[in-house]
Amino acid sequence: MSETATWQPSASIPNLLKRAAIMTEIRRFFADRGVLEVETPCMSQATVTDIHLVPFETRFVGPGHSQGMNLWLMTSPEYHMKRLLVAGCGPIFQLCRSFRNEEMGRHHNPEFTMLEWYRPHYDMYRLMNEVDDLLQQVLDCAPAESLSYQQAFQRYLEIDPLSADKAQLREAAAKLDLSNVADEEEDRDTLLQLLFTFGVEPNIGKEKPTFVYHFPASQASLAQISTEDHRVAERFEVYYKGIELANGFHELTDAREQEQRFEQDNRKRAARGLPQHPIDHNLIEALKVGMPDCSGVALGVDRLVMLALGAERLSDVIAFSVDRA
């Protein structure tokens, strides 16, 4: 394929046929388990507050909004799906487009396909088992292994991430030749993420998928704090062959705590000179009504297909990557 022929698909037709078969297989997986497929908006008047996510913003100027109404493309369908859970829909899944105004590269495209699902009355471990079932079915891989965030740091960096101070984290970063970044960083969680990215991720999931669970409580996001160890959150991530595939939570159901976390995110944004984002008060109001205890996970479908096909880049399994869109 000529590099100048940008009208052509970035993926081959055989790869697109295989991708379609995988999408059918995913839907069958959930249909067989009685999980309802849903569709939620791609745009919202509110967005994520996470300091590490950059959403796309647009403006609606239709009838009744001559002054314009700010809308955000969804980075994930999470907030709307949780409102459906509160409304009583039961277990649900969604295959949808998500958007993040971030990097483009081998494993990234600003527009991508997300698989997200929620299981009322599942704890984190039961959902991890279901994710493992899906990966084995789609990838024909071995059963996954699991280790805690603390175990991962102790095994590969010889440091305890739950007790180490910033000086110790910078010392660990120096061993990875990351002092030029770490020495200027004051946020402890950013230091931990730096160490995880460069010191842990390259070592896990080489032969089989690997679940890393019980992230620090300070990185809980929308997950519950463990009742057994308040230092950690009921959150997990899945890695395979150098790729982060999924991020899951035992979901937070406390409306007040969730609102406080959103507000804390915005304070962190302000401290970093980042724009503060509108909080999704519809989600907060729904949580006040009461969301069933549940666990949920978001999985990158393009990355899953890339692994299933043995492709080198996301663009090999997407009809038109952003540079050809």
From Swiss-Prot:
Catalysed conversion reaction: D-beta-lysine + L-lysyl-[protein] + ATP = N(6)-((3R)-3,6-diaminohexanoyl)-L-lysyl-[protein] + AMP + diphosphate + H(+)
Keywords: ATP-binding, Ligase, Nucleotide-binding
A Gene Ontology molecular function term of the record: acid-ammonia (or amide) ligase activity
Enzyme nomenclature, EC number: 6.3.2.-
Any single Gene Ontology cellular-component annotation: cytosol
One Pfam family per UniProt: tRNA-synt_2
Highest taxon of the lineage: Bacteria
Signal peptide region: none
Chain residues that bind ATP: R100, N101, E102, N109, E244, L245, G300
Binding locations of substrate: S76, P77, E78, Y118, E251
GO biological process terms held by the UniProt record: lysyl-tRNA aminoacylation
Group of enzyme by EC: ligase
Gene3D superfamilies per the UniProt record, alphabetical: Bira Bifunctional Protein, Domain 2
Family of the protein in this entry: Belongs to the class-II aminoacyl-tRNA synthetase family. EpmA subfamily.
Quaternary structure and interacting proteins, as annotated: Homodimer.
Role, per record: With EpmB is involved in the beta-lysylation step of the post-translational modification of translation elongation factor P (EF-P) on 'Lys-34'. Catalyzes the ATP-dependent activation of (R)-beta-lysine produced by EpmB, forming a lysyl-adenylate, from which the beta-lysyl moiety is then transferred to the epsilon-amino group of EF-P 'Lys-34'.
Protein name: Elongation factor P--(R)-beta-lysine ligase
